[in-house]
Amino acid sequence: MRRFLLASVCVLISLTFTAAPGHATYVREIVLDNGLKVLLLEDHKSPAVTFQVWYRVGSRNEKDGKSGLSHFLEHMLFKGTPKTKPEEYSRIIAKNGGRSNAFTTTDVTVYFATMSRDKIGIQLELEAERMTQAFLGETYFEPEKKVIQEERRLRTEDNPVSALAEVANAVAYTVHPYRRPVIGWMEDIQNLTRQDLLDYYRTYYSPNNAFIVVTGDFSTEEIVPTIRAAYGKIPRGPVPPKLRVQEPAQKGERRVILKKDAELPFLFMFYHAPNLNDPDNFALDVLTVALAGGRSSRLYHDLVYQKRLTRGVDADYSSVSIDPSGLSISAQLMPGKEPAEVEREIDGLLDKVKTDLITERELEKAKNQIEASFIFAQDSIFGQAMKIGYYEATGGWQRMNDYLDGIRTVSREDIRRVARQYLDRDRRTVGTLIPTKEKVP
């Protein structure tokens, strides 16, 4: 193990993970005395650097009645600091040839920019300042609240499919905070106060509750002292409260019907499934791709090509989450087709996967798709940073080591076993969108 001699403020360790046979990538890990972890991956293919700050806080950390706090705070961090004016952060990055943005999920809040090697220090300093010195003034609080409420209207309330997924998700989880939308419920957003934001900011925005990911054309020996100078002086914050909520086992199918102005009916099925802490996650990934990973997949071939019941069909499963997640199947129906008919067809196809082994060709095709996607996602420095960040946030970036090896070990018997175990109708929630031109109260 290679070690670098640095000041006592940090420890630097060089570690590796293998993204593909014969392709080694070197991630170097720093931990400052204040608890801030920094993950560095040099890649000199193009003259750019991606710098990301990940906070270990998302909608799962919010309380009932306070949904949307994480996302609201993300917006407010662009309203200035002692050294920058409102919205000036983005202008400074753009003026120096960079691109910047931020996003919030159930598990994390992330701020990022991609700039040239000689300019990345600008963003590094800006992010260090707003870690603890963001202006959360009353002047911008109420106007930004209206912006977020309008965002919710456009993305969810005026989008029938998003609205269905949101309400189905709220029914699928009865206890766990994953039941709440990341953007928040409209009434909760309306009732949030500036003091709520201040308390949340002081609780979760600190070096010991964050980590940095840097990828691209930089020198570790040069950037480490810069990071140390900017972030090492920020004091460690209080230890954020630990969230330990376990969703009770679902013991019966749940259903929700949403009547909304829409073009066509839509069907959404959600099955509870484990995250990356369970070794079954590899087989579930392969199962998901075999079911609906492309036009030759089982569901797509049957529902779209042969039976012409749906315009499309999709299956989604992500093991990269802090808590157990789910496997979902969704489909937009063809005109004149009934949701019950499509549901029966899907159930029949799922039953076949539970009773009969998928073919060797299906297995290898799904594995190849997953491997290609995993490697392609790291083709850009931004994609590399995102992959490292998500794994670090949910279980440790080192788990990237195991992913492709885990996929390669999946057998046809594994696929049948996890299909039987997790595609259980007593463990699912079915959401149906019924189009209507009438205003539903």
Go through the PLM ranges and name each one.
Residues 26, 31, 90-239, 257, ...:
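Charge-rich, well-structured scaffold segments of protease-associated domains
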Residues 19-24:
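Boundary at the C-terminal end of the N-terminal hydrophobic targeting segment
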